[in-house]
Amino acid sequence: MSASAQQLAEELQIFGLDCEEALIEKLVELCVQYGQNEEGMVGELIAFCTSTHKVGLTSEILNSFEHEFLSKRLSKARHSTCKDSGHAGARDIVSIQELIEVEEEEEILLNSYTTPSKGSQKRAISTPETPLTKRSVSTRSPHQLLSPSSFSPSATPSQKYNSRSNRGEVVTSFGLAQGVSWSGRGGAGNISLKVLGCPEALTGSYKSMFQKLPDIREVLTCKIEELGSELKEHYKIEAFTPLLAPAQEPVTLLGQIGCDSNGKLNNKSVILEGDREHSSGAQIPVDLSELKEYSLFPGQVVIMEGINTTGRKLVATKLYEGVPLPFYQPTEEDADFEQSMVLVACGPYTTSDSITYDPLLDLIAVINHDRPDVCILFGPFLDAKHEQVENCLLTSPFEDIFKQCLRTIIEGTRSSGSHLVFVPSLRDVHHEPVYPQPPFSYSDLSREDKKQVQFVSEPCSLSINGVIFGLTSTDLLFHLGAEEISSSSGTSDRFSRILKHILTQRSYYPLYPPQEDMAIDYESFYVYAQLPVTPDVLIIPSELRYFVKDVLGCVCVNPGRLTKGQVGGTFARLYLRRPAADGAERQSPCIAVQVVRI
């Protein structure tokens, strides 16, 4: 397998690592030696550096990575692949009884084509768990749902996950976390959950992906004009100048950032695409050399000031800052809200080397112990990127596996009294892979469970007793981080810049064109994927490192994922309390956050 040094350097830059040329060449050799592509190799390297607490990248770290990590892990993976290639896939997430019934139906069909004298010769079923003896198998009862074996009768639990020693460790905190008792009332209080629409909420499936290019163009143009109008009013700008109009004096232009080619944006390839009203959608190259500070990405709506003497190139001298939406104003119904605890977790809920749901069962135990008022659970619940899903080793329909997983969560947490909110993911293999993504459909809820369980769309703005949560399972931090270019005179926090873009662009996915694996229906995107207000709390799970940050008054939380490869990951818990109304300055209702290892 060949590897590109340039691609490796770009992958490393996504994680903020600059590498010497000699080390890049060494990584190229490792890619060829171990049969890895650039993305996979960098992912393994970052995982190694994170687990061993290494900072930076040196030749010693690279040698250690090769000898202690790659040679063991990848050779083991190749060995297991060769070993498994000679037999059928593991029988996961299906009862042995169902397998036996399938075998018997096949026998009946075969016997119908033979003469009666030959009789029925049933094939014996032999597995390591059930040798060739008289079999006695009973059907599963619903009470076995919480047993790991019910998810995967023949799968081996992950040894690395079960041998972890840091469970329950608080890895980062925010606010008054030390003085908070991290236990809720199990929904015993007055909990009100409402989905906010902009202008309406997505509640069901829709016809997707039949869109014409003019319709996409219309959505993008409307976005430029609407945001431009808000910024024009905020900064008291008299008028915008057409992009292609030559002028000797400084001009103010409105447009959307783009790239002059299909490659990654850089400071030499920036173009500004004008709005329809003033510039008829014209494009003009932008010279950023006069700007001391900037942060730009494709699809960003901006107002620039600069010199455009020829009408063919803008020398930018000023970049106007974006302006976020106002915060939600609580109503009288929200006035009796005192305090509540919210738990947030993001899938996958299985480790990469096993399809058993041990991490999910541990999370259920945490919920029953802490009794949070609300639990927000993000997909994927059955990960499309899991090895056994990709290799078609599962013997039960994806939909059935998901329903069993869902039933386990609902029944397993019923005693806690917690309200459950389920947010889908584009990596949920059974669900519609379109953005915005409709809520899960689950018709087996009892009347009592319907009061406690809520299915919302991806993305979604959710009000919990008047505290607005922005929810998205899409890894926007990773997507925007890979495309953003920036220049700063001082130290600049990359995550804070990206989060600020989300809030000031007023969209759950402001990047255009989107990442290749994103299937966006732009007509629905315009209706369902915009921010109605600036959320009090933005939950934005990512493969990147967990964090909690206050950005423009919004508490932004990356809870991490519940599993990271073969090891346990993290989840978050938040403590909400409505501040006193007599204060002149706004105070966040989210007073404390902790990110905890499962």
From Swiss-Prot:
Keywords: DNA replication, Nucleus, Phosphoprotein
Keyword Nucleus: yes
GO terms, biological process: DNA replication; DNA replication initiation; DNA replication, synthesis of primer; protein import into nucleus
Modifications the protein undergoes after translation, according to the UniProt entry: Phosphorylated in a cell cycle-dependent manner, in G2/M phase.
Record localization: Nucleus
Gene Ontology, cellular component aspect: alpha DNA polymerase:primase complex; ciliary basal body; cytosol; intracellular membrane-bounded organelle; nucleoplasm
Ranges for region Disordered: 112-167
Modified residues (Phosphoserine): 126, 141, 147, 152, 154
Chief place of localization: nucleus
Record bears the keyword Nucleotidyltransferase: no
Signal peptide span: none
Function recorded in the entry: Accessory subunit of the DNA polymerase alpha complex (also known as the alpha DNA polymerase-primase complex) which plays an essential role in the initiation of DNA synthesis. During the S phase of the cell cycle, the DNA polymerase alpha complex (composed of a catalytic subunit POLA1, an accessory subunit POLA2 and two primase subunits, the catalytic subunit PRIM1 and the regulatory subunit PRIM2) is recruited to DNA at the replicative forks via direct interactions with MCM10 and WDHD1.
Family note: Belongs to the DNA polymerase alpha subunit B family.
Free-text note regarding domains: The N-terminal 240 amino acids are sufficient to mediate complex formation.
Assembly and binders: Component of the alpha DNA polymerase complex (also known as the alpha DNA polymerase-primase complex) consisting of four subunits: the catalytic subunit POLA1, the regulatory subunit POLA2, and primase complex subunits PRIM1 and PRIM2 respectively. Within the complex, POLA1 directly interacts with PRIM2/p58.
Record-given protein name: DNA polymerase alpha subunit B
Gene: POLA2
